[in-house]
Every structure is written in structure tokens, then in C-alpha cells.
């Protein structure tokens, strides 16, 4: 069973990651030495807990942004995504379809009309509902005994 991490461990690991992100790695031993160098931590046990949680958070950061942790590299990446402009506009009907029209549903057509893009030729296609996939149940996927 897992252990509960104290507020001290979580806060200090978060601060260490925000300030020293480029130095940290996915290796506990390396992070432990870095924690030793950059912070005055009262006990060896507390240092190990902070280094362990730092390593855990670093692994989570590798998978994607982590709530509550913001560092320069992550902010730059977010800024780049916000400033993204596609090569070909989705509203450029000359390049997007063979028929010279956009294929949209009724809601999108209403939205385009509301935004003043009603001069764009559109082809309304009804939306089809995807069938929900039957997921297996736990306990060996046995059928229920009703």
C-alpha cells in the first residue's frame, strides 16, 4: 500500500522542480544529490522523500503538463501551441475537398452563418452516432448470473 506524502514534501519538491528543472533527471540518486546541493534539508529521511517525489513528478512531466507546476520550458511550449497557425485554413474550401465545398454538420453551418461566413459553400452532412463499445467487466469477464 502507498504512503501519504506530507505537505512539506509536496511543496518543496514543486519549488525545486520550478527553479531547477534543467538540472533534474528521472533518476532518484541524481535528484537526491541535487537536492543536497541546492537546499538545506533537516534530515536524510526528509531529503530522500523530497528527492523521491521530485523524481515521481519529473516522470509525470515527461508524459505531459502537471497541474500546479509551471516552469519556463513548459510555458514556452504552451505559448508556441497558442500561437500555432495552420498551413491551410479549414475554411479554405478550394484545397480541402474535391467538390469545392466544405463538409459540415448543421450546427457548424449555423455557426458559420452567425459569424458572417455564409458566403462559403457548404455541404451539410448528417452526424452519425458512434455505437458505444461494450467493455469487459472485471473478474475474468464472466457473464453475469442473473
Swiss-Prot record:
GO terms for molecular function: structural constituent of ribosome. Signal peptide: none annotated. It comes from the Eukaryota. Transmembrane segments: none annotated. GO terms for cellular component: cytosol; ribonucleoprotein complex; ribosome. InterPro entries: Ribosomal_eS17 (IPR001210), Ribosomal_eS17_CS (IPR018273), Ribosomal_eS17_sf (IPR036401). Keywords: Cytoplasm, Ribonucleoprotein, Ribosomal protein. It is found in: Cytoplasm. SUPFAM superfamilies: Rps17e-like. Component of the small ribosomal subunit (SSU). Mature N.crassa ribosomes consist of a small (40S) and a large (60S) subunit. The 40S small subunit contains 1 molecule of ribosomal RNA (18S rRNA) and at least 32 different proteins. The large 60S subunit contains 3 rRNA molecules (26S, 5.8S and 5S rRNA) and at least 42 different proteins. Component of the ribosome, a large ribonucleoprotein complex responsible for the synthesis of proteins in the cell. The small ribosomal subunit (SSU) binds messenger RNAs (mRNAs) and translates the encoded message by selecting cognate aminoacyl-transfer RNA (tRNA) molecules. The large subunit (LSU) contains the ribosomal catalytic site termed the peptidyl transferase center (PTC), which catalyzes the formation of peptide bonds, thereby polymerizing the amino acids delivered by tRNAs into a polypeptide chain. Belongs to the eukaryotic ribosomal protein eS17 family. This is Small ribosomal subunit protein eS17. It comes from Neurospora crassa (strain ATCC 24698 / 74-OR23-1A / CBS 708.71 / DSM 1257 / FGSC 987). The gene is rps-17.
Amino acid at each position: 500500500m502507498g504512503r501519504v506524502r506530507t505537505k512539506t514534501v509536496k511543496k518543496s519538491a514543486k519549488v525545486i522542480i520550478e527553479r531547477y528543472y534543467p538540472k533534474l533527471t528521472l533518476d532518484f540518486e541524481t535528484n537526491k544529490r541535487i537536492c543536497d546541493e541546492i537546499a538545506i534539508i533537516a534530515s536524510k529521511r526528509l531529503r530522500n522523500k523530497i528527492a523521491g517525489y521530485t523524481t515521481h513528478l519529473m516522470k509525470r512531466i515527461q508524459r505531459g503538463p502537471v497541474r500546479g507546476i509551471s516552469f519556463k520550458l513548459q510555458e514556452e511550449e504552451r505559448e508556441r501551441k497558442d500561437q500555432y497557425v495552420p498551413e491551410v485554413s479549414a475554411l479554405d474550401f478550394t484545397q480541402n475537398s474535391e467538390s469545392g465545398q466544405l463538409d459540415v454538420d448543421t450546427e457548424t453551418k449555423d455557426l458559420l452563418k452567425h459569424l458572417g461566413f455564409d458566403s462559403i459553400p457548404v455541404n451539410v452532412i448528417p452526424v452519425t452516432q458512434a455505437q458505444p463499445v461494450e467493455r469487459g467487466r472485471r473478474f475474468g469477464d464472466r457473464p453475469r448470473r442473473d
